[in-house]
Amino acid sequence: MTTDINGTALAVFIFFFVLVTVMGFVASRWRKPETLAHIDEWGLGGRNFGTWITWFLVGGDFYTAYTVIAVPALVYTVGAYGFFALPYTIVVYPFVFMVMPVLWKRAKDFGYVTAGDVVHGQYGSRGLELAVAATGVIATMPYIALQLVGMTAVLKALGLHGELPLAIAFIVLALYTYSAGLRAPALIAFVKDIMIYIVVIAAVALIPSKLGGYANVFASADAAFQAKGSGNLLLGGNQYVAYATLALGSALAAFMYPHTLTGIFASNSGKTIRKNAIMLPAYTLLLGLLALLGYMGHAANLKLDSANDVVPTLFKTLFSGWFSGFAFAAIAIGALVPAAVMSIGAANLFTRNFWKAYVDPDVSDAGEAKVAKITSLVVKVGALLVIIFLPTQFALDLQLLGGIWILQTLPALVFGLYTNWFRAPGLLAGWFVGFGGGTFLVWDAGWKPLHLISLGGEPFTVYTGLLALAANIAVAVVVNALLPAKAPVRA
């Protein structure tokens, strides 16, 4: 289970992990309500998070441990194309500023907890509600599993191998999430985000000085790409359209996920959400700096088993033991916060849009909270089992599909905020075409999220999620136009 352990790094790592564990259990008494036996309190923190709590929570939830590992890994592998995450996390915030306060008000006014609640309230359709809820759950499961991939990379760099350390970390996470609900990741997010800022700023300031400066970093990366015949410091060929459509599609999908919507619904006002849409791009700046670590991996001449090892190996090689332990703790804690919120978001969906809708319509508030707590445990265990017993590539493929799938819920969730013209049968038909068609196109392309199309005789590579969304909307419009008019049902 252990090899090549740096005692100082491990001690620092354990200290911060224990610190956030204590904070997780203390969180049940932070901003304590009369009772946590209500899904509004356990699953949404009482809908009372202000600007700063929301900023740390959404930032900690959106910019995950896997982001810290995967973005530099992608840049290390393909170069400039890996920077698509920057425009994606810029374009998303005007969308958040305009749409999310409207969605928050709808949820607040009618007591909705999930996207499925909003859809059922707008259209009165259990079928459409179930489609949206099921999509949210299955898109979230691999996302949680990938947080474990990020944590595994860190544990490996610490010299801890095997499943036991990972299982212990997730058991601890499960226990304090069960106890405190959304308050636990909200409180821990303060520590996680501050630690990540310190690590990334220190890395981009100190590491280049040890590698001959940024000129040498870029020159080394360019030489590495030229030597292997793939990747580049600049976009080329037909990458521009692929880059732009991937960024746009990812931006539209980002706040359709249950975990990001949970952060929105937990806010105390639409004004808080708008302030966060203005402030959250600070994390995008951090992400841009983080991506540069991929180029630094080439300058450091790292020998890697996997591109996902570039950040942990870089820190282990170039930082002192105590700071590498601090950095590894920041990344590991960066897995705990989003994993907790994701499991809560998935649990809320199951409880409200399956259990209450089909199993026990008269379930009490306390019963709802109990079902959500148990479901959150099951979700975490499921994600852990995926990583332990299935190839990591399985989780990666599912996550790739998850982004395309969750994007297909946008018409049902967002269009009804602005117009009553659309109706459930059309939206459900559109969802089915987008979901099925997007899945087929990804499979047909060899499990790649990009598809080659021809316009005016010119070939373009386009993000499959946007193609599926276009088909989704087109089908919804056509079917809706053929249906007799019917007033919306909002309850």
Curated annotation (Swiss-Prot):
Q: Which UniProt keywords apply?
A: Amino-acid transport, Cell membrane, Membrane, Plasmid, Transmembrane, Transmembrane helix, Transport
The name of this protein is Monocarboxylate transport permease protein
What range does the record give for the signal peptide? none
InterPro entries the UniProt entry points to: Na/Glc_symporter_sf, Na/solute_symporter, Sodium:Solute_Symporter
How this chain sits in the membrane, per its record, is: Multi-pass membrane protein
Q: Name one GO cellular component term.
A: plasma membrane
The superkingdom of the source organism is Bacteria
Q: Which organism is it from?
A: Rhizobium johnstonii (strain DSM 114642 / LMG 32736 / 3841) (Rhizobium leguminosarum bv. viciae)
Matching Pfam families: SSF
Q: Where in the cell is it found?
A: Cell membrane
What is the activity-regulation note?
Answer: Inhibited by CCCP, but is apparently not affected by the concentration of sodium.
Q: Name one GO biological process term.
A: amino acid transport
